[in-house]
Amino acid sequence: MKKILTVAVTGCTLLLASGAVLAQAKPDVLVKQRQAAMTLIGKYFGPMGGMAQGKVPYNAEVVARNAGFLEALSKMPWDGFAPGTQEIKSRALPAVFSDTAKFKEAGDRLQAEAAKLASVSKGGDEAAIKAQIGAVGKACGGCHETFRAKQ
């Protein structure tokens, strides 16, 4: 019982400390973190998109692995859009900060579709997996059209 309590207290302390660190993070650091998360999302989603489009041979093991990474990564960038980060040069459009409800919906949609892909990828149904890859791509693209500046 003592061990469980120690683990619980330690976990809560780390959770609170990580929140405090995030709250104190400088805007430029937050922007770099969100950009890194988005880069990794692209890295792990890209091959799956290629498979869904028939440009790359389908590989169920790669899809399952990448879908798991994508599910975790889809949760990471959003804290990087904190107040104050709009002053840092990036491709985030002003709408990210002025229409926060719509932006949050878009982020939530990506997370939900990525979670579905991670689940579907374990089933082995190639057609269902490719359809879900398309749904993830649509979630990504929908956000990019509204909230990201063109290069």
What is each of the regions a protein language model found here?
Residues 17-20:
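N-terminal signal peptide c-region/cleavage motif recognized by signal peptidases
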